[in-house]
Amino acid sequence: MGLHCHTDLARAQALAQELRALGGQVGLYPGDVAERAQVDQVMEGFLQDFGHLDVLVCNAGLARQELFTDISLDSWRQMLGVNLDGVFHCCQAALPHMISRKAGKIITLSSMWGQVGASCEVAYSAAKAGVIGLTRALAKEVGPSGITVNCVAPGVIDTAMNGALSPETRAALAEETPLERLGTPEDVAQAIWFLASPAGDFFTGQVLAPNGGFII
């Protein structure tokens, strides 16, 4: 298993150690997915250590709330650079190796805001909508090579990314969700695991949405 990180190396190292303690073979590869050269280095390092790639999970993400009229060009480019360009870079780096083996799975991470849009998150919503479009189109292109491409689009998940939300906002979001709770990282992980497992072999070009019914 290869872990990639950019902003929090200490936490990534701790996770790698935890997985190794459970018996896993884990490599850690720092790099910025928005920079193609760094993605190529990550892929090269992984393939040197493990030989081949079975599953690629594109889950690097960045979120920021801004009024549309306040978004600077730099902010816009950063948001799309991480959330959309990063997926493009990772898929392009991985696909030659998957195509040569005629096997592989790619799982991208979008958001329910990529499906319906979010006020004050136009850049984020646009990037995540782009991820869904990329996933569906790429699934058609590489399906004949035996490669599946699917997307997970979570709802409101109880993570550090949403840590700035007030208790009142969190309660309101939970109330707005038919299952009356926020999602957990485990909810998202189970969706990814399903698509990566043999149970997901006949799924491609699909958007799996663990959102508790927030959007239906």
Task: Describe the predicted segments one by one.
Residues 111:
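Residue(s) in the substrate-gating loop at a strand-loop-helix junction
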Residues 67-68, 75-80, 162, 173:
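Substrate-binding pocket helix/loop in short-chain dehydrogenase/reductase
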Residues 91, 127, 135:
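Active-site helix of classical SDR
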Residues 1-13:
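Conserved glycine-rich Rossmann-like NAD(P)H-binding loop of the short-chain dehydrogenase/reductase
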Residues 96, 140-144, 201:
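Alpha-helical segment proximal to the catalytic Tyr-Lys
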Residues 9, 30-42, 73, 186-187:
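The beta1-alpha1 cofactor-binding region of Rossmann-like NAD(H)/NADP(H)-dependent oxidoreductases
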Residues 88, 99, 103, 181-210, ...:
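C-terminal substrate-recognition "lid" of short-chain dehydrogenase/reductases
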